[in-house]
Amino acid sequence: MRIEFTIPVNPRPKKNSPMILWRKQDFKIKIGARILATIPFTPFIVPSKGFSDFENEIMPFLKRLKDEAGVIDYPCNIQAVYYRSTKHTIDLTNLNEALHDAMVKSGLIIDDNRDIIAAHDGSRVFYDKFNPRIEIIITELKDYIQWNDTTTEQIKLL
């Protein structure tokens, strides 16, 4: 099986400038069993606004693709060619992670572990100032051995 599609968004990495927020809940600083201090707020990390905006832009495309192609629960190669609107230094690994996390959140793929996303062969980053986009080709890998039976795992999730 081969699925090809283009998403007309400017790709954003997930790990750029995450925000640290505080939740109103006791946070204990410990060494062993001994509590050194108690702070009335607990820190937690959320993705940057840029990534949240990217995820909101990409989600309708991924959900529509899931409705058309179904859920991917088999080993596949996800080739993603990213066209960015700027020439800023960018990490391909972080772009892939952002895309894969969005694919899981949309329900298009059941997980982004090695049993499902077995390869990223052919992924690249290019510059296109006037037409930023992500061109994606998902190809099923027939000769790949999964460590876990993902179809059984998927049934458990439903």
Task: Give residue ranges: language-model regions.
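Acidic, proline/glycine-enriched N-terminal capping motif
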Residues: 1-158
